[in-house]
Amino acid sequence: MGKKYKESTKLIDRKTLYTPLEAMELALKTAKANFDETIELSIKLGVDPRHADQQVRGAVVLPHGTGKKVRVLVLAKGDRIKEAEDAGADYVGAEEYVEKIQKENWFDFDVVVATPDMMGVVGRLGRILGPKGLMPNPKSGTVTFDVAKAIQEIKAGKVEYRVDKTSIVHVPIGKKSFEVQKLLDNFRVLMEAIIKAKPSAAKGQYLKSVAVSSTMGPGIKINSVKVLE
């Protein structure tokens, strides 16, 4: 355990459930690394992701973005290619990029957007993109003919959330360089989306625990009753 991490843990009472504001302030105070650390939420949900009717997945545009420059690859053809280029996509193409990923193990992108008519080709990448969480999906708005809108939302700070096999959702909500209020705004918008996404099949307590941390900092527990205050 590093010296900076030990110093950070002294600022936190492990038994306390903090208000969102207190937690965001502490997340910034405990971000002591000499780079712009990511501030991330970890939300434990009362769902069993082994069941298809208890999946929690979606996307939301954070009002202040995540602070990360997102590289977008668009797989499209015809008129959609120019539309994607004009909207600010970093890479636009079709089969040539599918082959590049397959043959060269190329991953210089963070999000993939595909038009529905490309999914037959994109389907070949399922085994490669799927485990990395990069496979285009209609639920997250990354399979669409409206590529311009998809790109604009992603560049504006759209984040995807998805419950993992341990029933936890991990989502970045900003950087150490953010003001507390911006983190708080992003936190509230994300929590509203996750609460709305509660599956009808989920029984009992939905928000089991909520914690925030910086890349190198300790977890700070948030009172789940007060997440929308």
Curated annotation (Swiss-Prot):
Key word Ribosomal protein present: yes
Coiled coil spans: none
A biological-process GO annotation: regulation of translation
Keywords associated with the record: Repressor, Ribonucleoprotein, Ribosomal protein, RNA-binding, rRNA-binding, Translation regulation, tRNA-binding
GO molecular function: rRNA binding; structural constituent of ribosome; tRNA binding
Pfam families for the chain: Ribosomal_L1 (PF00687)
Taxonomy, superkingdom: Bacteria
Gene Ontology cellular component annotations, sorted alphabetically: large ribosomal subunit
Keyword Transit peptide: no
Family: Belongs to the universal ribosomal protein uL1 family.
Role of this protein: Binds directly to 23S rRNA. The L1 stalk is quite mobile in the ribosome, and is involved in E site tRNA release.
Quaternary structure annotation from Swiss-Prot or TrEMBL: Part of the 50S ribosomal subunit.
HAMAP family: Ribosomal_uL1_B (MF_01318_B)
Protein name per UniProt: Large ribosomal subunit protein uL1
